[in-house]
């Protein structure tokens, strides 16, 4: 028996493949392998894998499976008729994550949403990956490679020169209520933020002598769709109870992105517009250069 395995090396694109039919009557099928989009995620423990296969033409659910490991996923083969499909995989999608519209009677690829029951939970990362594939022969074996990326963004705030024992607390005001993994962004990647928004708390931190005031790394939903900036509200509180308020606008956060806000206490203004510097494929630094909140004003 001659088996042809077709490796789809680029996820999130229409899959164009060469293939041969088998020389017996046994049907072929589709297998799914998972890889990491961000090399930093190599070695991540995976103990929960959900897999959906949708008809890309009408949005209907074709298959839905739940596995305990990536090996279980790779060992399964799906017998699919000729057609156009989108394969969605999600890993570590456990509480406080939830799946919206997740009933087999109504589930449609355009309705499926990943959300957080508590927007401020900052849980360990869950991951998703999508492959778009066309099957034009039913007795050929295909294998897809889904590149898995973070559902959530990461945000860390650093403020240099904050006086000792000052407290910082705040909120991100327009994080999305969820991510729609099978809807496309303008750049063609899968995974758009919802248009509905909510707030995410920035936990209390106290300035320690000799150290930069730094938040924990927050894991949060990306900026809600329809907004051109991420909106933050921060308060610095002196030991005597004097409160200074700061309204901040920054670039949009995307799913899987890592964002670092770097500020100087002496340069902070009540209204600040932050600009971005790219550090690597996933990470941006946001700083204040003295612009007014809306540069067009």
Model-derived features: positions:
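Bacterial N-terminal signal peptides that target proteins for export
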Residues: 1-4
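Conserved "repeat-terminator" motif of extracellular CCP/Sushi domains
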Residues: 145-152, 220-226
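Tryptophan-paired
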Residues: 48-102, 167-255, 291-297
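Bacterial Sec-dependent N-terminal signal peptides
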Residues: 10-40, 256, 280-297
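Exposed, polar/acidic Ser/Thr-rich sequence context and nearby capping/turn residues
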Residues: 146, 159-163, 225-226, 235-284
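Structured interaction patches on ligand/partner-binding surfaces of diverse proteins
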Residues: 69-71, 95-142, 240-268
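Secondary-structure boundary elements
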Residues: 134-140, 150-153, 160-169
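Structural motif
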Residues: 34-46, 158-166
């Amino acid at each position: 028996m001659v088996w042809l395995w077709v490796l789809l090396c680029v996820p999130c694109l229409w899959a164009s493949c060469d293939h041969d039919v088998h020389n017996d009557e046994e049907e072929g099928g589709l297998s799914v392998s998972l890889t990491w989009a961000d090399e930093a995620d190599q070695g991540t423990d995976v103990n929960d894998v959900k897999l959906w296969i949708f008809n890309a033409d009408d949005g209907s659910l074709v298959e839905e499976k739940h596995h305990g490991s990536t090996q279980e996923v790779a060992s399964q083969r799906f017998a699919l008729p000729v057609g156009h499909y989108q394969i969605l995989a999600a890993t570590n999608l456990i509480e406080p994550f939830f799946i919206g519209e997740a009933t087999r009677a109504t589930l449609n690829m355009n309705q499926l949403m990943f959300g957080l029951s508590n927007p401020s939970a900052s849980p360990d990362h869950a991951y998703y990956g999508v492959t778009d594939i066309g099957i034009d022969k039913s007795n050929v074996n295909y294998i897809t490679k889904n590149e898995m990326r973070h559902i959530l963004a990461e945000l860390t705030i650093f403020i240099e020169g904050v006086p000792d024992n000052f407290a910082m607390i705040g909120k991100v005001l327009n994080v999305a209520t969820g991510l729609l993994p099978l809807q496309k962004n303008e750049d063609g990647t899968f995974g758009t933020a919802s248009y509905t928004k909510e707030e995410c708390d920035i936990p209390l931190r106290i300035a320690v002598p000799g150290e930069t005031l730094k938040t924990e790394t927050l894991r949060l939903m990306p900026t809600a769709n329809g907004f051109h900036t991420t909106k933050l509200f921060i308060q610095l509180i002196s030991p005597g109870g004097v409160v200074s308020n700061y309204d901040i606008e920054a670039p949009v956060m995307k799913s899987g992105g890592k964002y670092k806000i770097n500020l100087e206490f002496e340069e902070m203004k009540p209204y600040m517009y932050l600009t971005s510097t790219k550090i690597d494929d996933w990470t941006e630094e946001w700083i204040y250069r003295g612009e007014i909140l809306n540069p067009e004003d």
